[in-house]
Amino acid sequence: MSATEGYHDGNNADVPFGFVFLDACGEGSDCWTVALSHEAIELVGDPLNNLLVQGPHPTDHRHLVFHQFELCDAVSGECYEIEGVKVQNFLLPGWFSRKVVEGARNDFMGRVQPGESLAPFSIAAGGYLMFWDDRAPEGRKWTPHFDAGDGMAGRAKLDAKLAARFSRLGRRCHPGD
């Protein structure tokens, strides 16, 4: 398992902050510019890492759950270049809507596969998401979900973040540790 490349949170005074760990970036597949842009984008979208959006359960669309308002996690396997610098793809507001808007982009790159766009509350290859499911057993309310492929890249990233018990996500999934 690789170390987490970065995370963002808020301190006890509600001041948002983010970290990128250069040593971990060297070990994994993402370069530091992708990790930095990932955390910067998510700091802008949810500075204190405390927002949730109601949406369908990934496997039972009739059941509603609360998804973390993370702008990069679902597309964390995708990046693009700006003047030769790799940066993270990110979600747009339409991704957080339960209704599909014909012709709308739900992520900045606007694709999952050629000719196929990313559906609301879905995951691109290499991505992951976390959601709160009130029907889940106690201690398992926070539930991970990975892309429809093998999910290994997203799983490795999420496992690293969960192991980092100092992050808000780590504290949510390991209360009392």
What do the PLM-derived regions correspond to, one by one?
Residues 2-13, 20-26, 30, 47-177:
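Metalloprotease/metallohydrolase-associated module, dominated by Zn2+-dependent proteases
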Residues 29-41:
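Short alpha-helix carrying the canonical HExxH Zn2+-binding catalytic motif
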Residues 39-49:
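Acidic, glycine-rich loop-and-strand cores that form catalytic or ligand-binding grooves
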